[in-house]
């Protein structure tokens, strides 16, 4: 038998930053959150961040593109940074 556990997450981001990211990289944040559903994604701590604990996630989105996502955990929400 194969089982999988799903965790519900809430995502947030700054709309202006999201628009700039889409113009620069061609990926909108609504698609980028698909990285969090990749079973093989990797997450490491962003050691360059001094203001808050940030993380770098590397994984594939639903279109099979490898994406790098910078994010922070704020309470119950995942805040996309870049």
Regions found by a protein language model. Give the residues of each.
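Ribonuclease/tRNase effector modules and their secretory precursors
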Residues: 1-82
